[in-house]
Amino acid sequence: MRAAETLLRAGLSAALIDEAPLAGGQIYRQPPESLRRPARQLYGSEARKALALHESFSRLRTSIDYRPETLVWGAREKRLLLSGPAGNTELAFDKVILATGAMDRIVPVPGWTLPGVYSLGGAQVVLKGQACLIGKRPVFIGTGPLLYLVAYQYCKAGAEPAAIVDTSDFTAQIGALPRLLSQPATLLRGIWYNAALVARRVPVFRSAKPQKIEIRGRQLVVTFKRNGKSFEIGGDAVGMGWGLKPETQLAEILGCAFSFHAGSRWHLPRCDAMGRSSTEHVYIAGDASGIRGADAAEAAGELAAFAVLEDLGHTVPQTRRQRLLAHLARAERFRSGLERAFPYQVPELAGDTVLCRCENVTVEEVRAAISSWQISELNQLKALTRCGMGRCQGRLCGSAAMEVLAAETGVEISDVGSIRGQIPLKPLIGARFQRKAAP
Amino acid sequence: MQCDVCIIGGGLVGCSTALHLVRAGKSVVLVERDRIGAHASGANFGGVRRHGRNVLELPLSTRAFDIWRNMGTLVGNDCEFMPTGHLKIARSEAEMAVLEQWSSFGAEHGIPVVLHDRTSLRANFPWLNTSSFGASFCPGDGHANPRLAAPAFALRAGAEGAVVIQGDGATTVEDARDEFEVTLHSRRRIRAAVLVNAAGAWGRHFARYYGDEAPVEAVAPQMFVSEPVPYIIDAVLGMVTGGLYLRQIPRGNVIFGGGRGILDPNCHRSSPSDRVFAETVGLAGDLVPSLRDIAVIRSWTGVEGHCEDGLPILGPSPRRANLYHAFGFSGHGFQMAPAVGAVLSELIARGFSETDISALSPRRFTGAKSSILAESEI
Ligand SMILES: Cc1cc2nc3c(=O)[nH]c(=O)nc-3n(C[C@H](O)[C@H](O)[C@H](O)COP(=O)(O)OP(=O)(O)OC[C@H]3O[C@@H](n4cnc5c(N)ncnc54)[C@H](O)[C@@H]3O)c2cc1C
């Protein structure tokens, strides 16, 4: 939205394509009209920012080619392939800014596929978009700022979280403080959420090692170990997530070069500070090129638009440009702090854990295949085990599969490869391509 | 490194040749530039059919049929081969005539087929559309999992003594007295008395070293897979026109192909075309109407060597002794590769094979233009 706004202000014609029915992205997602609630309640401390963004977007709406509920299912050269209310169409472009965001990163735990277990992002989507809760007494497991934010938002919405089970330890969080101080406001917000959770007596367990999730009677019971002792916490739902991972499939299809990012243990598209990718006409902004959060995403959106303008020969306001660059640099430092505070560690996975839920492939099966087929690369693993071959095409299991492969073979995680993306970027219904009516 | 036979190319053709040769007592080094089965052999449709093949391929195809039925015993993995039968659809009377004609060729080669008219199609294959004119059904043909086949052969060959090199391609081939010297990308060298050129779409390159020309070009057939849905399509489908081929696996996914994707300029890789995507997905919904309501989850392509006359380049080089070509399988190699290895190992180890592959010889391009009819379908 910030990128679009900047481009329009400079007099360019722009189209905004969004899979969601209403603007706002993940963080400032809007519920449908019938489920409207006050912004303060929906977005908490971020309400002002959310409102500002929604307002500036509604001013834009009439001057932009806005296409909600539209999926970009592929791209070739300077054409995007769209699937939306208008059917399947194409859109030619000169420059494209990818602001495709991120999704939850999941570490599989035995039982994670049970009904009632959600990702943290999913728990947030139902809350903001559908005004529902995953449960009245959810247990939240994982790590990262989202763990505390979602728990806090659930409290505000009237839930009473049974516990927060954090796999990182407190000393890591203290150790990361110097870096986190690069964004004092964000850090404060984090501390505030924590304090609010303490005030509400939500138990927080750090350095926890989740063992399993089970259904017992009408409860979901989470078992975890901490300092050698075993704990059980029951609730009526589970939300889990280990930070976010960028949605990079479109960048891949557009031929952008990637490199491995050690902090997030993931392959990220290579971009300059302004968001220029290695493909001349492709720019990337926000979480899509590395997780830096919402405020940084607004800055990055504007910067990517500046980059487009510069490359088209326009002049851009230099002081503003510098300010935004400095903001992003701070966000980058903050991110490295977060990566320390909430390191993404994949624990020793139990053999019977389902690794790929689409194809129901267990860790044990994957390990056996790695040794019997002498597998050393992720696409080979997929071809021989079906892990990552289902509906989500490895979005959910790809990261954990990389870890299992690296651990089994001793190959560096940076060298086991990543699952190759192809069209369609998301499942596409065949009927959309039907020329004739059914006979 | 010294060996009896060096094989360039770790597709199913190369891997099957390696296994048969080690079993015939030869020392073998197989060289694969990328990963075993990374190209056509791993990306293909998985159709295992004799049905509708060019008659000149039938001796080889028939022999392959026997191997496929015993794949488990041969390589220790059945590669998910399922003899569901193959159904070839005619949309008009003229197309039906093609099927009728083939049924008599089939009979001569011991491949009986059943012809269906519109009514019996409806009765036997209720999931099919109602607009097809007729079809021919070939029992025994079927499908297998291409992702498993080449790796299974390579693993077996390796276990029985073949040296399998991956991620290191052959860059040059030179004569070293009466032997071949193959230099790899890593500068490693391999000396071999016999060389097998099984480099798939890239085989022409090595053939040219010895002046063997073959009109083989790289093409990129495009594939699709749907989300899993209940298993109902219990035969492999093809069309007389070749525009679409389709199968379902018991897991539920429907796998289909048709049209060609886009080759990279250097012809090393390829990617799906969105235009072909729209066309082929549309065609699939025409043929099996229930497919209209299900989602396609992925499309992909593979690089295949396509010969002008639709037949592989298979047999000894007309110009260089001890050089064998086995490339350009023109969309038919997955089914035939297990037999290709058997025949080549007989030629190399014993000097003759009972399977007649003379019509596929590279010799056919040395002079007189051949008058062989093209059959381009996969
Ligand atoms: C999408 C698609 C669908 C198909 N469907 C069917 C089907 O249903 N039924 C059927 O029977 N056939 C089908 N085919 C055809 C079949 O897949 C091929 O004919 C067969 O796999 C060819 O095997 P190959 O070993 O010759 O080629 P490939 O599998 O391509 O192997 C050749 C290998 O040579 C290697 N190579 C090349 N140059 C060098 C070098 N310099 N050094 C070392 N290695 C080198 C390559 O990396 C490659 O791995 C299909 C093909 C495609 C692409």
Tell me what each language-model feature is:
Chain A
Residues 1-385, 389-391, 395-439:
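Residues forming the flavin
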